[in-house]
Amino acid sequence: MSLANRIEEIRCLCQYKLWNDLPSYGEDENVPQNIRRCYQLLDMTSRSFAVVIKELPNGIREAVMIFYLVLRGLDTVEDDMTLPLDKKLPILRDFYKTIEVEGWTFNESGPNEKDRQLLVEFDVVIKEYLNLSEGYRNVISNITKEMGDGMAYYASLAEKNDGFSVETIEDFNKYCHYVAGLVGIGLSRLFAQSKLEDPDLAHSQAISNSLGLFLQKVNIIRDYREDFDDNRHFWPREIWSKYTSSFGDLCLPDNSEKALECLSDMTANALTHATDALVYLSQLKTQEIFNFCAIPQVMAIATLAAVFRNPDVFQTNVKIRKGQAVQIILHSVNLKNVCDLFLRYTRDIHYKNTPKDPNFLKISIECGKIEQVSESLFPRRFREMYEKAYVSKLSEQKKGNGTQKAILNDEQKELYRKDLQKLGISILFVFFIILVCLAVIFYVFNIRIHWSDFKELNLF
């Protein structure tokens, strides 16, 4: 990781903290109480998805939020290992009917289930679901039915096979379709229903499915250790059995090289969906929807680069740095930037790829495909033209050309002044902390520095 990239991440973190004001619908008194509580539940279940959902435009934002909460409720039932199968299966299969029942709640989740509270207050979600237009409700209901059936099938399979529910790569694709691909398909239908995107997007099922599969497969790779400790095995036997006779042996230090080769095989499988993700993003025309879809996809390719040939995957949950995540959020605002970020992380994977790995060729081919698709979607010559046009536009704005004059009114000047004050105070505070730490170190280790010591360094 270069120093320049680290500095850029720090800059993005400061910019995000100081100037990025996220909508606070969960605390806004002007928002109806039920909707407010739904936003609070959204924050509780997923901070990352909450950020991108809240940035969606009116008319689609609440539909996507309810869609997410409904499927998160379904997922919470599936993930709960304390629920007996005879209790779990009917709930999963009938969940699409349950969301039509006013007042329904569920209090039998395990005490350690992290999203337990969502089901305890699920009547709030149902009430807002019933307030959506019929078109939105039909999309959510249909996807919930398909997903519930798929989850029930794989839950019963895991029960029969001591936690193993995925045997072949075909099973793997099918499972990921049920738990994530359907989310991508449902979102495409919601976007088309809102009229904010082309109606034909609702029929782009293959690439919509890939959008979800890419995210899910990356998460399954990253969560190896967490899932293994919970006796949940989502890596397909068809892949891991080539490297070990027991799934748990991948954790053993003696098998580290075989484990990394297995990880490479899983990475190659996930990369097959990256090109579809880029093609899907190229079809979006609404800025907020583009951001909503692009940010998780870039996060996924960044995570894949972080876990690739990383032995820590088998011991802990590997995540990208916070500064890296913020940098992705700020930059994933157009197709050019997204292609550039995909290329950056794809090249990180290609750089770590080694000819000693039996999957070297597969990884190289998939990385090459991403390069080709990025070039076809946004050729290099157009990137240079885009950069020049963008710089020219900024220059015109600064000069005050056209109808948009770069003259700040008093209110804007006051806001900028306050922001600069905050930045200055933050910098001074950091320097103060550094000085205090140095003082403590000098005191503890009895270090004495005299002015003559500085003179000997010939600094002045």
Curated annotation (Swiss-Prot):
Cofactor dependency: Mg(2+)
Domain of life: Eukaryota
Gene Ontology terms: cellular component: endoplasmic reticulum; endoplasmic reticulum membrane; nuclear outer membrane-endoplasmic reticulum membrane network
Transmembrane parts of this sequence: 425-445
EC code(s) of this entry: 2.5.1.21
Record keywords, A-Z: Endoplasmic reticulum, Isoprene biosynthesis, Lipid biosynthesis, Lipid metabolism, Magnesium, Membrane, Multifunctional enzyme, NADP, Steroid biosynthesis, Steroid metabolism, Sterol biosynthesis, Sterol metabolism, Transferase, Transmembrane, Transmembrane helix
Disulphide-bonded residues: none
UniProt enzyme class: transferase
Keyword Transmembrane helix: yes
Subcellular location: Endoplasmic reticulum membrane
Subunit structure as annotated in this protein's UniProt entry: Interacts with pof14.
Family that this chain belongs to: Belongs to the phytoene/squalene synthase family.
Its job: Squalene synthase; part of the third module of ergosterol biosynthesis pathway that includes by the late steps of the pathway. Erg9 produces squalene from 2 farnesyl pyrophosphate moieties. The third module or late pathway involves the ergosterol synthesis itself through consecutive reactions that mainly occur in the endoplasmic reticulum (ER) membrane. Firstly, the squalene synthase erg9 catalyzes the condensation of 2 farnesyl pyrophosphate moieties to form squalene, which is the precursor of all steroids.
Miscellaneous comment text of the record: In Aspergillus, the biosynthesis pathway of the sterol precursors leading to the prevalent sterol ergosterol differs from yeast. The ringsystem of lanosterol in S.cerevisiae is firstly demethylised in three enzymatic steps leading to the intermediate zymosterol and secondly a methyl group is added to zymosterol by the sterol 24-C-methyltransferase to form fecosterol. In Aspergillus, lanosterol is firstly transmethylated by the sterol 24-C-methyltransferase leading to the intermediate eburicol and secondly demethylated in three steps to form fecosterol.
Entry protein name: Squalene synthase
Organism in which the protein naturally occurs: Schizosaccharomyces pombe (strain 972 / ATCC 24843) (Fission yeast)
Gene: erg9
